[in-house]
């Protein structure tokens, strides 16, 4: 049995723009509803949602039949959390709150087996097709994609050092936390924050490192894509449900 191909990673390396949807709802039913919607990727968030390994597993199973790539954000840059997500078959990880080169190297080590990393070895995980993928430990890294999230002024100051760590496939800019770091909480559209984001995208483009972002502002999303973001999340499932239901109720309010 062969290792599944990571189409997200292949497209990222080919320089293709990929549009995504952020998913905070923990249910597999919701995941399957959005899977065939037409997005290139969906992110299952476990940092700012009730989700964990046991809720992400059925989400992976729910989207598997569809032409969409799952990405998972662990709650932190924790090698144990990362190991558990890799073991259930996650192939693309977005690691949050990476502040410096050392933390970037720690994330890389977490996705690699010894002697090059610290990922624990098990031959009977879902990722190995329960022992049916020959030489999984030697070939797994080929299809694992590591994205690091930059979300503070401090991290922006070390962007080049973080992005050029060997083993990092892409860098994601987090507008919400970045706004707070700049002293503008709740204002990701503040001119100072926007300028910092656009500058970061430009710096990553110079490095040849794929850049990503989440913004439900369609105008700004298009702007980011034009500047060079490779993986751009343009909406959040919770917001779509909340704002859509409010708008429908408002249209019929008496």
UniProtKB/Swiss-Prot annotation:
Keywords: Lyase, Metal-binding, Pyruvate. The record marks 87 as: Increases basicity of active site His. InterPro entries: Aldolase/citrate-lyase_domain (IPR005000), HpaI (IPR012689), HpcH-HpaI_aldolase (IPR050251), Pyrv/PenolPyrv_kinase-like_dom (IPR015813), Pyrv_kinase-like_dom_sf (IPR040442). A divalent metal cation binds at residues 151, 177. The keyword Protein biosynthesis does not apply. It is an enzyme of class 4 (lyase). GO terms for molecular function: aldehyde-lyase activity; metal ion binding. Its cofactor is a divalent metal cation. It catalyses: D-glyceraldehyde + pyruvate = 2-dehydro-3-deoxy-L-galactonate. It comes from the Bacteria. SUPFAM superfamilies: Phosphoenolpyruvate/pyruvate domain. Its EC number is 4.1.2.-. Aldolase which can catalyze in vitro the aldolisation reaction between pyruvate (PA) and D-glyceraldehyde (D-GA) to form 2-dehydro-3-deoxy-L-galactonate. NCBIfam families: HpaI. Belongs to the HpcH/HpaI aldolase family. This is Pyruvate aldolase.
